[in-house]
């Protein structure tokens, strides 16, 4: 999941640059063009890691065929060491990592360091966009990591035994403020763990205190389904739960924005 590059054989790695800005959708690509880890492929949140033609929330999940094509043109194989990075302390590398995890890439990790820190550590950088040899990789999808809308509906009805955990801020969770989606509130029955709590001084951390905070919301032996507004900021919460050795975790990629897209979908406030 989250790993310092100091612990990795970076010379044998394949790199994915997932930098992005929700406020400026072109920023990640501009930063990549200015400088990136040598050999890194750029994956864009909107163009590669979402299917914006769909109506299933604000960052809908791409079809498996599209993800397979992304992996193949990126030259990836299932047994590759793949290091994904972004600005550091952001949700975009975890989002990219989750798709790799879902597809069966067992050695994909999220760099704890953002690009500036990677460069400061002396990793080679350049402005060249690589053209990797196309692979014929065949993903091995693990559906136990994915929560469909139907699964979440069954969870709300009490039929799955999974615990919903909302990764948004407490004020959005309670429905007091909603700056993005048209309906304020949360999916009924959800608990709350603000993804910003996963960070310390702008960097993800996984110490004993954080594990205690997570366990105070949901126990490791419970099955957990995480969501946020659009499936982006829930990805680091998913990754951190796995880091904390929670064995049964799912991600509702459509998240709250998908949930409220259905007329008369129930929501809770307070």
Residue spans for each PLM region:
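Cytosolic catalytic domains that perform sulfur/thiol-centered chemistry
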Residues: 1-270
């Amino acid at each position: 999941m989250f790993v310092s590059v100091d612990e990795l054989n970076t010379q044998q790695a394949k790199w994915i640059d997932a930098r992005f800005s929700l406020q400026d959708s072109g920023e990640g690509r501009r930063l990549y063009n200015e400088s990136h880890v040598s050999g890194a492929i750029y994956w864009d949140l909107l163009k590669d890691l979402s299917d914006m033609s769909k109506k299933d929330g604000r960052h809908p999940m791409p079809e498996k065929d599209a993800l397979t094509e992304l992996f193949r043109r990126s030259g990836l194989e299932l047994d590759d060491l793949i290091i994904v990075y972004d600005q550091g302390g952001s949700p975009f590398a975890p989002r990219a990592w989750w798709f790799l995890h879902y597809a069966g890439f067992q050695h994909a990790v999220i760099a704890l360091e953002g690009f500036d820190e990677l460069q400061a550590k002396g990793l080679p950088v350049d402005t060249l966009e690589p053209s990797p040899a196309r692979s014929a990789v065949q993903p091995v999808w693990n559906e136990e990591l994915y929560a469909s809308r139907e699964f979440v509906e069954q969870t709300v009805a009490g039929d799955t035994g999974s615990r919903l955990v909302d990764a948004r801020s407490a004020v959005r969770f309670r429905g007091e403020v909603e700056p993005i989606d048209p309906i304020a509130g949360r999916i009924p029955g959800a608990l709350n763990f603000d993804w910003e709590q996963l960070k310390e001084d702008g960097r993800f951390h996984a110490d004993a205190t954080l594990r205690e905070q997570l366990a105070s919301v949901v126990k490791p032996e419970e099955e957990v389904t995480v969501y946020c507004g659009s499936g982006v900021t829930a990805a680091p919460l998913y990754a951190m739960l796995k880091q904390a050795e929670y064995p049964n975790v799912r991600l509702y990629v459509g998240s709250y924005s998908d949930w409220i897209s259905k007329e008369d979908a129930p929501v809770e406030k307070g």
